[in-house]
Amino acid sequence: MTSKNSSKDPVGVLGAGSFGTVIANMLAEKTDVILYARTPERAKNINDKRESSGQALHERITVTNDLELVAKSCNVIFPVVPSANLRELIRRMSPYLRPYHILIHGTKGFDVSLPDNKQLNANRPLSRDYVKTMSEVIMEESSVVRVGCLAGPNLAGEMAAKQPAASVVASHFDEVINAGQQLLKNERFLIYGNSDLIGVELCGVLKNIIAIGAGVIHGLGLGENAKALLISRGMVEMIYIGQALGGNTKAFIGLAGVGDLIATCSSQHSRNFTVGTRLAKGEKISEIIESMEETAEGVRTIEIVKSLSEFYKVRCPITEALHNIINEEMTVGDATTYLMKFPFRAEIDFL
């Protein structure tokens, strides 16, 4: 399958949040970029100020609210929007998308579509049939088949400050991986390739849960030993649920797995880590979410994974404990005691 566009064509970015803006600025070092903002007013405001999410825009970036313009101008597009919004966005863009497009998303969350307008209930078992990764959403809602995922330890603030980092572009198609590497790789940003698309996507989604747990440990002042315990057992929990959902264990021990987990569980700039810290201080989850400018994907992921674990009979004690804290069924102190008393057996039994 040949590409319609030449290397001189601009690249699209869907989403003008902190990470979307970082990606747009990075791409603009090599090519023209069209950055999509969710409303005409926001697009105009960003264009006028030449700033988005506290970051100055590169001169090669144009901001728009026109999805048709993005699709018709760009062969390669990076969707970077919250998971709860991606399906609706791709559905609106679908009339303009064609099989020649390449979409590489940077969203670390699940899509849940339940029959008969049912609401997600974490205490009700939920099968994989109703839970989709972002690449699956893109392929369901459009004619695009060349889909990829950008994942790894990519804290937006550090990348905006031009500090060194690395990421993974995962796809079943080599040309998608090559496109991601050619467009994004530079002297401070390494890009690795991985053919395990589902595994890499699951890494990015599931680590957000553990990051909230690490934030709780930090908020309680329990020290580095406790955080190391939480992170290492969290990795095991990620692998258990990841295997149940079709992921390969190898992805979890790479940059998109353990790499992203370490970064997100160690940085007070991580939104999910911040949620955990504030929960430990006694704030209610509704107050925390309302006060945050951008989405902390881990909160919703906890409820989804709790339901999935019920269906697949996978014990996820960290997820269960965080679910109980969020829903005020257990205090933070009681949840910590619960985890310390949990009957873990062999340390490693997934290899």
Name each model-derived stretch.
Residues 13, 35, 103-105, 149, ...:
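Structural beta-sheet core signal
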Residues 85, 96, 137-147, 164-212, ...:
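Internal alpha-helical scaffold of NAD(P)-dependent oxidoreductase catalytic cores
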Residues 2-65, 69, 92, 135:
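NAD(P)+-binding Rossmann beta1-loop-alpha1 motif at the extreme N-terminus of oxidoreductases
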Residues 57-60, 64-161, 180:
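Rossmann-like NAD(P)(H) cofactor-binding subdomain of soluble oxidoreductases
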Residues 17, 21, 40, 64, ...:
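Electropositive phosphate-/nucleotide-binding environments in soluble metabolic enzymes
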Residues 2, 214-218, 243-253, 257-351:
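NAD(P)-dependent Rossmann-like dehydrogenase/reductase catalytic/cofactor-binding core
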